[in-house]
Curated annotation (Swiss-Prot):
UniProt source species: Homo sapiens
Glycosylation sites: 3
Gene Ontology CC annotations of this record: plasma membrane
Disulphide connectivity of cysteines: 95-187
Transmembrane domains' residue ranges: 24-44, 53-73, 98-118, 138-158, 195-215, 236-256, 270-290
Descriptive protein name: Olfactory receptor 14J1
Keyword Electron transport: no
Function in brief: Odorant receptor.
Record carries keyword Glycoprotein: yes
Length: 321
């Protein structure tokens, strides 16, 4: 039994105290994590290997998959280990790192989704200037800005959140170190800086959402003027998955962060945290690949008998270096 008064870390309550449910939770999360790992690694590999996919759209998609891979790895493996051991304790250093990487990667994901929507807008609404707008250098700078902005956001949240004096027991009613849940432990009126920073971050995310929506309003108005039904279908099949992913992620995360914290644990908190921490990284590979003919063709080519020997030779050459 963990001593709540003397421990320097935190106690993550997770989903249940019953041993059978803890094992079930660990198994479900393990299967989900392996699916997310496989799907995102497959997308990264396909885009890297197939030269036909070396375009801005797939370049950003590769970085989204990399972000998803890192994002789900921040929370799920720790939660699986805690459930298997029947111990929800997490050290202070682990919690600080988890908050930093969680906020950094979530912020980067919002930013990359915004960049991807602008890329689609430029490709469809300004096709004559697309190669100039989204040249390789601009794409690299956009991705670098995404990662730097996410890192700064995570650094600020971690620094401010862990400088707040804690007055309550170090019990977090979540399966990871969730900032809104941690604010419940803060002394009265001592977390105004974190609330101000959270408000700024939420405002930035809202601006990103508005940018995405405006981009797609312009995109759909342009698409509806395309005379060919086949052309409209092709554009919709490319754009709708991205719009769904962005809306789902931002809506679930926004609902969780904008809710007023209560003193008791809530099933709603746990459900919505799963919606924006576990489900998007798992479903994104499926959403982007199933409706994308180029991705499916590249996957078939990579798995074909003619291509497999060449892939093996490339891998052997890489390992020899």
């Amino acid at each position: 039994m963990v001593n709540l008064t003397s421990m320097s870390g935190f106690l993550l309550m997770g989903f249940s105290d019953e041993r059978k449910l803890q094992i079930l939770h660990a198994l479900v999360f393990l299967v989900t994590y392996l699916l997310a790992l496989t799907g995102n690694l497959l997308i990264i590999t396909i885009i890297t290997v197939d030269r036909r996919l070396h375009s801005p759209m797939y370049y950003f998609l590769k970085h989204l998959s990399l972000l998803d891979l890192c994002f789900i790895s921040v929370t799920v493996p720790q939660s699986i280990a805690n459930s298997l051991m029947g111990n929800g304790y997490i050290s202070l250093v682990q919690c600080i790192l988890q908050v930093f990487f969680f906020i950094a990667l979530a912020s980067s994901e919002v930013a990359i989704l915004t960049v991807m929507s602008y890329d689609r807008y430029a490709a469809i609404c300004q096709p004559l200037h697309y190669e100039t707008i989204m040249d390789p250098r601009a794409c690299r700078h956009a991705v670098i800005a995404v990662w730097i902005a996410g890192g700064l956001s995570g650094l600020m949240h971690a620094a401010i959140n862990f400088s707040i004096p804690l007055c309550g027991k170090r019990v977090i009613h979540q399966f990871f170190c969730d900032v809104p849940q941690m604010l419940k432990l803060a002394c009265s009126y001592e977390f105004i800086n974190e609330i101000a920073l959270a408000a700024f971050t939420t405002s930035a995310a809202f601006i990103c959402l508005i940018s995405i929506v405006l981009s797609y309003i312009r995109i759909f108005s342009t698409v509806l003027r395309i005379p060919s039904a086949e052309g409209r279908t092709k554009v919709f099949s490319t754009c709708l998955p991205h719009l769904f992913v962005a809306t789902f992620f931002l809506s679930a995360a926004g609902f969780e962060f904008l809710r007023l914290p209560s003193d008791s644990s809530s099933t709603v908190d746990l459900v919505f945290s799963v919606f924006y921490t576990v489900i998007p990284p798992t479903l994104n590979p499926v959403i982007y690949s199933l409706r994308n003919d180029s991705m499916k063709a590249a996957l078939r080519k990579m798995l074909s008998k003619e291509e497999l020997p060449q892939r093996k030779m490339c891998l052997k050459a890489m390992f020899k270096l």
